[in-house]
């Protein structure tokens, strides 16, 4: 499955969503999700952010392409994602959780490790904080 994610920064904060459905229900993640048939990657990231957070965004550029394979307890692959993560700028809307996100919140960089979040997601976020000024 091809998916997109959005890194949306506000000074020393990043917008995070808490997942409301499996996989990784209750874990925190970047807003994003699956690309629908006929949709461009940028259309998909704008739609997913709008659905999950209520915000309108402008994708500024691709930060990373990330592959994730989630396995069941027996080691059999259950989910295989190729994720394209964009650095984005919020351009409008009102923050509110929606669709499959149970919460949408701005999180300060030092508080990220307090959340239930995958190491892979943390790595992408740190890369985003380090490189975000390259995206205008």
Regions found by a protein language model. Give the residues of each.
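Conserved N-terminal beta-strand and adjoining loop/helix that marks the start
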Residues: 1-14, 87
């Amino acid at each position: 499955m091809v998916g997109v994610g959005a890194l949306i920064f506000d000074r020393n904060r990043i917008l995070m969503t808490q997942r409301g459905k499996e996989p990784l229900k209750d874990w925190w993640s970047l807003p994003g999700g699956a690309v629908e048939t006929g949709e461009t990657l940028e259309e998909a990231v704008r739609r997913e952010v709008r659905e999950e957070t209520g915000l309108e965004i402008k994708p500024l550029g691709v930060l990373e392409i990330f592959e994730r394979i989630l396995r069941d307890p027996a080691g059999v692959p259950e989910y295989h994602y190729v994720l394209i993560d964009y650095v984005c700028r919020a351009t409008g809307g009102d923050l509110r959780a929606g669709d499959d996100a149970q919460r949408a919140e701005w999180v300060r960089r030092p508080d990220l490790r307090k959340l239930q979040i995958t190491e892979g997601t943390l790595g992408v976020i740190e890369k985003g904080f380090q490189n975000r000024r390259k995206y205008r």
